[in-house]
Amino acid sequence: MTIRKMVALLLASVMALTVGVACAEMTPGTYEGVAQGFGGPVTVKVTVDAAAVTAAEITGEGETPALGGAAIEQLTTALVGVSDAAAVDAVAGATVTSTAVKEALAAALAQAAGEAPAADAALAFTAGTYTATAKGYNGPVEVSVTFTDSAIASIEVTAHKETAHVGDVAFAPMIADMLAANGTGVDGVSGATFSGAALRNAVNDAAEQAGCTNPTAFKTNTVAHEPQAAVEDTWDVVIVGAGGAGMVAAAQAAQDGNTVLVIEKNAEMGGNTLVSGGAFQSVMPYLVWDAADPDATTGVNPLDGQTYDKVKSDIGRIETLKTILGWSEEPFDGTIDAEHPFVAGDIGLNAVRGVHAEYLPVLKALKAEIQAYLDWAQPQLDAGVNETQLTVFSTMNLHIFQTYYGGLRPNADHTAWIYSDVDLVKQFVEGGQDIKPWLVAQGAKFDYARQFTLIGCLWQRENSPVGGVVDGVEYASKWGAYFMVPYNTMTKANAHNQLMLRTTATELIVTDGRVTGVKAVGYDGTEVTAHATKGVILATGGYAANIDMVQSTNEYWDASFIADNIGTTNRSSLMGDGITMAAAVGAATEGEGWTQMMPLGWVDNGNLAGGAGENVIYVNAATGKRYVDESAERDVLSEGAFENGMSKETAEKLGLKYVPGIYVEVSNTGVTAGPGGFNNLPEDVPGRMVFRTVEETAELIGCDAATLRKTIEDYDAYVMGVSDTLEVPKLSIQATVGDVEKDENGNYLPETYKLENLRVRFMAPSTHHTMGGVKVDVERHVLDADGNAIPGLYAAGEITSGNHAGNRLGGNAVTEIIVSGRAAAQAVNADNE
């Protein structure tokens, strides 16, 4: 749910405050000030007598409901009786909104005291060019602004680190509007809130340097975007959402000969996929153990005909396979009591519970595959060969079964369990085999040599996009492979095919019980009516950015973990719009009580930090000890962080914004966050990452240095094989924290071990993925409460339920969105043949 406008009003009779410092005597009346908030201008209108505020009204249209909205209500109360803005305390967790309120109040009080120009006073500047910076999503945004004596002449963003095609798309339209408005009170751009706010703040700073004579007017000056003539047209397929699932569906629909319209609320295609790691889970048979040629050390990739070295196993894979081999084949028993405890991520406990009937055939087939592998591997292990020298075991059945037990979870009060729909899981696991061939045929490029891990993925099964080539031009990474390539396929298939940006779908059109189109509105208010002769595909993503919705639907997490100020890895546009539209036409929903937390969230903004758990350790800042299996599922890691998070005092000492669950990641200095645009430079990043000695790290986080050193050395001893126990067990390990050499067979040489410098990161869980959503079948028809398909309506990607149950494996999302996007488009075509 989106609250467009929050207004709080309180009269003087409600309360009065005593403050320490007063302004000069004020002229009684009503005054207004404006300052930049998180999502747009915040306006404070106050009525004053000669000494203080007697009534206050605060308006902040763009502020986040759960944070800025709550702060506005609280601060409105606090303003009555105030005569000095400095006396108003900020609201915890809403610093940006609080600061805006105080600045706007100061401007209003200055007018009342005769110390500021009237709101309608003319603008004047000291002509010249000024440089200013403001904090963006990923770092400082620097601008160069040139003023005449009365207006902005030019604005140039001279440096920034905002995400390409996500944050940086705010700059051009907002700069154009600022120049036309001669001020910064212009509309932001959906999906780029942080970046737009940084641009506004930087331009405001430049105006202040230029001696702006009327800051209030400058910050409120805007342009009115008048609606254009209403748009009404017809396509075969209308798709809502231009993220990964939507653009894949568009390309498939176009390949099938359909005309296609894609409606996207943001200023560019990409959706949440563009801010994800981008890797997808799918076993590449030529890179893993082959029962038909068990001793092979290389394999041939059928896509390029080249030979590649097979991937070696991580430490601990054999033990996991043996646990699965011993998995009970009895019907699943969900009893949870003292004798049958539930511990998220403990597959040993789940193995004795049995298996749901739908997954029994998968388990039996997998056991046969595992037994064949162990018959080959065990003699080598018995002969002293290190596990890391063996080719890794990996099959589609393993992927299916790990998706099953990785998402098998009870609700918070242990009265019900949730698990994935086996048909949907089989669909995306098996369909994952065709992702590379299909996209490569259109121009995409992938890393063919690796099957790596990322956080919470459970196995070495990840694949990374390299980019894509369109008309001889190469586009990097996710943008190239997942967006420019399918966009090119769509647009070249038919001149009528279109991507409509900055346009928000508002409702589905239903004719005689069938969904026949979409109503939408452009950023300027232009009305759009898009008719679909064959079907509508919803690919709007989830709602992890809608903290209110996450909190209200929660059935899994301790409520205290989902604080109002929790971060999110999602773009601000991921609010659950598509689910709401689908429900309005009778769609059933399920599984919304399970929201995935991403343990690798930066503390300052919730953004995805990237990385894996097999090559790092997580440390409690107070004790200096490990507290969790870092290679476990994401909910396990997040719960561990919440339960072992640092104190507010420690966070503030480190200069970190306090949120629940801040923890310390420690690794070798050579570890990187992986592909996908993450910061992999070996340098300090304030508030995020530092490089320090063990002793310096201990002093920094406030733990005992000897304890921290022992924690790391004990862990490394286990990794090197010097010790056979860990205080906190770990299923899969790739590397030591300290430096150590290996012999030609890959065995560690403990005598070369040394522990000196560390790579240290500060992170906390962020909302990341909503596993629940609209109910669908394998053809991606949207189903009603009775299980019947709603004619003409399909859905793909995170908007749907049934794929991941209570916890999603890392990398499964991208696999699922690509496979389901294609499946939905193919179903539309098949249903209309």
Regions found by a protein language model. Give the residues of each.
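N-terminal glycine-rich dinucleotide-binding loop that anchors FAD/FMN and/or NAD(P) in oxidoreductases
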Residues: 275-320
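Glycine-rich loop(s) and the adjacent beta-strand/alpha-helix scaffold that form part
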Residues: 523-601, 780, 820-823
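Active-site- and interface-proximal helix/loop "cap" or "latch" segments in soluble metabolic
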Residues: 25-221
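Glycine-rich FAD pyrophosphate-binding loop
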Residues: 255-275
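Beta1/beta-strand and adjacent pyrophosphate-binding region of the FAD-binding site
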Residues: 227-245, 261
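Conserved redox-cofactor binding core of oxidoreductases
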Residues: 331-526, 547-548, 712, 719-755
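A glycine-rich dinucleotide-binding beta-alpha-beta segment and adjacent secondary-structure elements
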Residues: 507, 707-803, 807
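An anion/pyrophosphate-binding glycine-rich loop and adjacent beta-alpha core
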Residues: 379, 579, 588-707
